[in-house]
Amino acid sequence: MNVYESCPEITTEHLMLRLVHRADAGGLLKVYSDPKAQPFFNADNCTSDFRYTRLPEMIECVNMWMWSYEHGYFVRWTILHGETPVGTAEMFRRDDGPDGRGCGVLRIDLHSRYERGRVFDELLPALLPCCHRDFGCAQVLTKAFSGSGERLAALGRHGFVPAPGAVRCHDGTPILDYWVHRA
């Protein structure tokens, strides 16, 4: 399956993930303007810190995510609880994995009310097979800061281990706090 021709929708018991839409911007602004959620956002290698307070900023960001999907750079799903956007998940493949299959990077940004172990326990088993299979990645990296206790615990429950040493940005800059899941 080519995720850039047909983006998979992922449904769990309480959540749905689907390709981000422009109409999501208003709901996502509540996520990206949440000061309790902002410390958990991963902006490594990004042109923004994802801390938005105005709708035009969020619309511009969503437009960039959609453009990036259309050009095959990454998939950005909106995470919905019912009809309400409560976060996003992003996945892309880096072709510098040690086994030649590439390495995926998974970002998960959630409103602070959803930054809970039980939410990750629902998201990760649904997302990880797609990340490995549809992106062709032998391993998936995700960032989790030392203060993100429930996220860290959930990563451990779902087979993630701390990445050995620093991960390198595209320009070689070392970045820390990554966890790895192997297929």
Regions found by a protein language model. Give the residues of each.
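GNAT-family acyltransferases
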Residues: 1-114, 129-130, 134-138, 143-150, ...
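Conserved acetyl-CoA pyrophosphate-binding loop and the N-cap/start of the following alpha-helix
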Residues: 114, 118-127
